[in-house]
Amino acid sequence: MITVRISFKNKNEASYISLLDMQRVMQRVLKRSGLPVWHTLGFNPHIYMTFACPLSLGQESECECVDVKTEAEAPDFAQWKEALNAIMPAGIEVYNVEPVQMKADLIAYACYEISYPADAAPVLAQYNALESVPVEKKSKRKTKTVELKEYVPALELHEAGEWVYFPICLPASQDLTLNPSLLVAFLEEKFGLPAANANILRTKFLTADKKVFA
C-alpha cells in the first residue's frame, strides 16, 4: 500500500471552507473521481485521509496537503491530478500528487505572506521599533502570553502594486503553534490597522532544520 500526498492551493472563496467541510469536500471529490483510494474497515467505511496542518478560516494557502492511501501498484499520478482538478470546487487547485516523502510530524514552521493596502506601509514600519510584542494565545484549557518578537523580530516590507506585504515564519509543531492572526490582531490594536484589510497567505512549511516540507 502506498501513502499518497495530494498538494493543493486553497484561495479566494475556498478560504472560507472550514476544516470539517474541507474533509467532506475531499471525501466527496475522491469518491466522484473514481480513483483507487483505500477505505477504512468496519461498519462505517470511509476514505482514509489526514491533513498536515489545518488552515484557519479566511486564510489562503499555496501549500495545503492531504494524505490518502492506495493499493494500486503503479498509480498514474498525472491522471490523479487531472481527475481531481476536473471536479474540485472553485478556489481549490491540485498542483502535485506523489508518494509521501516526509511525514507530517516533521513540520516545525509555517510561513506566510501578509498583505495590506500600500498606504499601510508607514504604519507597519513602526513595528520594527517596538521592543516587545506580547500577545495572548488562547487554547481550550488556558490563555498564555507569548512574546511575538522572538519569532517576528521585524517586518520586511515589499511593495506589490497597490499592496505592501511582508513574509513571516511561525512555529507550527505539536509543541507550539502560532496563528498569524495573532500578529494581525496586534497590529489592529496597537496601530489601528483593520484586521479586515489584511490578507494572509500560507506559502510553505519548514522542518526544524529549515528544509522545505514536501
Ranges and model annotations:
Residues 1-8, 14:
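Hydrophobic, proline/glycine-rich low-complexity stretches
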Residues 8-10, 68-74, 114-119, 168-172:
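Short beta-strand-to-loop capping motifs
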Residues 14-39:
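N-terminal ordered "arm"
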Residues 38-68, 101-103:
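Short, charge-patterned binding micro-sites
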Residues 61-113:
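Ordered, amphipathic secondary-structure segments that act as subunit-interaction surfaces
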Residues 78-88, 123-131, 182-184:
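Short amphipathic alpha-helices in soluble, non-transmembrane regions
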Residues 104-119, 153-154, 207-214:
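Short, low-order "capping/linker" segments at domain edges
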Residues 132-214:
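Core RNA-modification/binding signature centered on pseudouridine synthases
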